[in-house]
Amino acid sequence: MSSFSTHNFVAIATFVCWFCCLATAAPLTSKAAYLLKRNSLIEEDASRKLGAKIVLTNEEKVLDDFILAEKRKLIDDSRLNQTEYMPAASFYRSKDFIDTTFAYKIIQDMPKGGALHLHDLAIASLDWVVKNATYRDNVYMCMDKDNDVNLRVLQLIPPDPFCVWKLVATERANSGDVEAFDDWLKKNISYLSTDPVTQYATVDSVWVRFNKYFAQVIGLLFYAPIMRDYYRQALEEFRADNVQYIELRSQLFGFFELDGTVHDAEFGLNLYKSVTEEFQREYPDFIGAKIILSGLRFKSQEEILNEVKIAMDLHKKYPDFFLGYDLVGQEDPNFSLLHYLDALLYPSIQNPPYRLPYFFHAAETNWQETEVDYNLADALLLNTTRVGHGFALIKHPRFTELAKENGVAVEVNPISNQILGLVRDVRNHALVPLIADDYPIVISSDDPGAWEASPLSHDFYVALMDLCGRDTALTFLKQLALNSIRYSAMSDTEKVAAKAKWTTQWDKFVKTSVEGLKPHINDRS
């Protein structure tokens, strides 16, 4: 091409680009054209949110309309009248309100798929712990210096001048009012006996109380016969809440017998396995449960390496039930994933390399550019299957891109995040932008027993009312249920079977719900 023609080409191309930019930026000539452009922009934005690809059936649309009617009224009443929006308030205050709503009742009835982020000592209700577990033989209690009750199963009473052990049965009988005693005991253990949002000024002070809960119950619930029944009760409660599948993080080590025998991790895994299999035989509609070994992030590097080796052995021996390894506990004051790097790399440096799945808690924090939120970098580089909490993920655009590219879902636990001090008003949850852009998200409940939440329905309700917009309801809820199967650690074959079971229950739920709404449909028509 000649120099002259090259210059002409460049000039023409420049003019075309300038003209196109001018046309794009030019003011719209009419209000109608402006509104058309505005609607198009809003629709394009909405098309990217979680659940936007779901196409509802006619029956589902009926149900969606009823949920949206209540949701919009609550939002509009609060926004226009400047009154408190209760679904986003402290769970301590909002729980009773939530329980009265139409949307919550629908969510309770709705098959929600799986709960993928749960911990072993807070999965069944405190009502069961108090009314069943503390009524067993050899259950003792003592009051510590803070007047908190500690519970243990004991054969021999240890001398302890700071916490004198007394038989619970005797204390209950001597109280003169069994119901009042049990109510007092439950309130003493429950994290919801006060409002954590106003009671605790910092995240650290919240965690002091949270860790106290585990100290109060571990000596009771780790007694092997009680743990067996406690886990069975948890499965009953999750199934009653229309949850079909769970993935449970458990320490596995330390279940004990009355004679002082302390069991290893394989015993703990087999306890869960036998109860799960028995439960599935009794309830074939229940998809199942699987276990993740959780180490504590204040342990030594040598202890974590030993746990990783045990996790490898369990994964080889029980590949269909044992999923992998995680590190749990408050991230801010404890060791980072990088601190344990040699231990966590151990499986990959074997010959041949062994792929031990990881399910790391990472960035459960409000801080930025610290070793805590940089746990995300290590979690992703160590090929974590999912990220627990991931509260600070949105602050790291490259981490966010990498996680989405690799299909690494975030396990969001909205009530837990509020109760543990990360967000007061759940509408301001850090991960709302990811939900608005259809990032891989699952909703779980973390430790529902500790704060008297339902197994999963309360968290689904809070997610519906606070984490997505005014015009979003059943598409969002349905996508969350589907995500819980898609991003579970089940095999591909298991996922196909799980989705089939879930679909059967979903279709039945929609039909039954719409049938129940028919009188109200007629009233509205």
Swiss-Prot record:
Signal peptide boundaries: 1-25
Binding site for substrate: D120, W207, V208, R209, F210, N211, K212, Y213, F214, G329, D447
Pfam families, per the entry: A_deaminase, A_deaminase_N
Tissue-specific expression: Detected in egg cordons and in the developing central nervous system. Not detected in adult central nervous system (at protein level). Atrial gland.
Enzyme Commission code(s) on record: 3.5.4.4
Gene3D superfamilies: Metal-dependent hydrolases
GO molecular function list: adenosine deaminase activity; metal ion binding
Entry annotation: catalytic residues: E364 (proton donor), H389 (proton acceptor)
Cofactor binding annotation: Binds 1 zinc ion per subunit.
Catalyzed chemical reaction(s): adenosine + H2O + H(+) = inosine + NH4(+)
Cellular compartments annotated: Secreted
Superkingdom assignment: Eukaryota
InterPro entries named in the record: A_deaminase_dom, A_deaminase_N, ADGF, Ado/ade_deaminase, Metal_Hydrolase
Top EC class of this enzyme: hydrolase
Glycosylation sites: N81, N132, N188, N334
Binding site residues for Zn(2+): H117, H119, H361, D446
Classification via NCBIfam families: adm_rel (TIGR01431)
Family label: Belongs to the metallo-dependent hydrolases superfamily. Adenosine and AMP deaminases family. ADGF subfamily.
Known role: Adenosine deaminase that may contribute to the degradation of extracellular adenosine, a signaling molecule that controls a variety of cellular responses. May play a role in the regulation of cell proliferation.
Protein name (database record): Adenosine deaminase AGSA
Organism of this sequence: Aplysia californica
